Design a protein with these regions (language model features):
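Conserved NAD(P)H cofactor-binding loop of Rossmann-fold oxidoreductase domains
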Residues: 77-87, 230-231
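Conserved glycine-rich Rossmann-like NAD(P)H-binding loop of the short-chain dehydrogenase/reductase
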Residues: 26, 30-43
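Conserved Rossmann-fold SDR core element
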Residues: 151, 160-175, 221-228
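C-terminal substrate-recognition "lid" of short-chain dehydrogenase/reductases
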Residues: 201-228, 233
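A glycine/serine/threonine-rich, flexible loop-to-helix segment
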Residues: 173-196, 235
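N-terminal Rossmann NAD(P)H-binding glycine-rich loop of SDR-like oxidoreductase domains
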Residues: 14, 21-23
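Rossmann-fold cofactor-recognition segment
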Residues: 47-61
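Catalytic loop of short-chain dehydrogenase/reductase
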Residues: 89-104, 108-110, 117, 121-162, ...
């Protein structure tokens, strides 16, 4: 699928991976890109092809109204996690925090369920999971569980959605604004998090966004996961 003249929706499109995806979509000639988040005013890009919309992926009524306003479109991308990400040992983890990690699944389920009605039959969907979904490491039990559920969900509905394609992008450790750490603490965190990887650095949001563009454009892939992880899976 060529991006030129296409109408594309990006959930979580106001920072990090989502924002970088929007930049690439605009650079590649998309006719209209909708950046959806709970705080769309964070986006500083001002282009006539870019439309900022406010919505919460966990609010079903909000999503129904959003898709009704937008109407027919060609591509659905969601990088929005929809909730918190509990980290740490499972046996000492706050169980509500663990349960809330699955908001990622409910958010994706909602955008697919309510978004597919107006999606072109030649269109496609790209969701973002994460390397811990298939290569768990200590302290990542909540992220691994939720990510695994997301990947199972996407594959389970691949046949039902066809001819619409659906694929997953699985990032490893990525340096994005989601991390609250600053300065040396931030540098040390990413160094320690990637020391066992084959590529010993954090990835960038742009590197993940390029994979999303690939998944959109390549018409011979569906129901699969593309790893952008610096070798996390093999570490």
């Amino acid at each position: 699928m060529k991006l030129k003249n296409k109408k594309i929706i990006v959930f979580g499109g106001t920072s990090g991976i989502g924002l970088e995806t929007i930049k690439l979509l605009l650079q590649n000639g998309a006719a209209k890109v909708y950046a959806i988040s709970r705080n769309p005013k964070k986006v500083k890009i001002r282009k006539k092809q870019l439309v900022l919309e406010k919505a919460d992926v966990l609010d079903e009524n909000s999503l129904k109204a959003l898709f009704k306003r937008i109407g027919k479109y060609d591509v659905l991308v969601s990088t929005a996690t929809g909730g918190e990400r509990a980290i740490g040992p499972f046996l000492s983890m706050d169980m509500q925090g663990y349960k809330n990690s699955f908001d990622k699944l409910w958010g994706y389920a909602n955008v697919v369920r309510y978004g597919v009605k107006n999606l072109s039959k030649s269109g496609n969907i790209v969701l973002v999971s994460g390397s811990p979904a298939r290569k768990p490491k200590p302290g990542f039990v909540a992220i691994s569980s939720a990510g695994g559920a997301v990947e199972a969900f996407a594959r389970a509905i691949t046949h039902e959605l066809a001819p619409i394609r659906i694929n997953l992008i699985s990032p490893g450790v990525i340096d994005t604004p989601m991390s609250p750490l600053k300065g040396k603490a931030r540098k040390d965190f990413y160094k320690n998090s990637t020391k066992d990887n084959i590529i010993k650095r954090a990835g960038t949001a742009n590197e993940v966004a390029k994979a999303i563009i690939f998944a959109i454009e390549n018409e011979f892939i569906t129901g699969t996961t593309i790893d952008i992880d610096g070798g996390w899976i093999l570490s």
